[in-house]
């Protein structure tokens, strides 16, 4: 895979995603209007911090130019925030710090537009871990989002069936799996 092909394919994905959102959101709003409803359309997206870490091209910032976009859902959670990064010459996971930067980049992107922003956190993540790890990192991302007083809308449980019905390891050193522990489900 050449750098030129990577660039061109990323440029194509950017264009197709931008166009698809414009068409789908415009249709949803027009259809809603024909039924007497004011349909709001929000883009669920990771932060530009995360996309740069994962080397993904996104039209995220350009979406502000689309009148059909009412705002964003900032998809920040352990899976994005635990991506190792460099600080003071050392590469390691910094979940709280990275989450804080991710939420900040999302707030900064929308603040000038006046559009609505939802901050998302997820009590688990896509990679198989244990309940103690999920809880520790969930609390780090949850705390990071609360440090943005201008944001008052949250998506706190994006996939409830995955959280409450999923089986995950009881500890890092065990293969035993259980549903969410009582102490953690109460916190949710």
Residue ranges with predicted function:
Residues 1, 9, 184-188:
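Generic hydrophobic, helix-prone segments enriched in Leu/Val/Ile
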């Amino acid at each position: 895979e050449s750098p030129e092909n990577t660039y061109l394919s990323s440029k194509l994905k950017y264009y197709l995603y931008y166009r698809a959102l414009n068409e789908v959101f415009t249709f949803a709003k027009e259809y809603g209007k024909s039924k007497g409803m004011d349909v709001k359309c929000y883009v669920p997206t990771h932060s530009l911090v995360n996309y740069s870490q994962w080397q993904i091209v996104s039209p995220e910032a350009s979406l502000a130019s689309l009148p059909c976009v009412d705002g964003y859902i900032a998809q920040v959670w352990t899976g994005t925030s635990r991506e190792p990064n460099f600080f003071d010459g050392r590469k390691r996971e910094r979940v709280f710090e990275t989450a804080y930067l991710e939420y900040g980049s999302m707030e900064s992107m929308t603040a000038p537009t006046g559009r609505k922003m939802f901050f998302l956190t997820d009590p688990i993540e896509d990679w198989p871990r244990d309940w103690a790890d999920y809880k520790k990192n969930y609390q780090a991302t949850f705390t990071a989002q609360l440090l943005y007083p201008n944001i008052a809308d949250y998506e706190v449980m994006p996939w409830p069936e995955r959280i409450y019905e999923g089986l995950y390891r009881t500890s890092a050193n065990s293969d035993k799996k259980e549903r969410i522990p009582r102490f953690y489900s109460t916190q949710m």
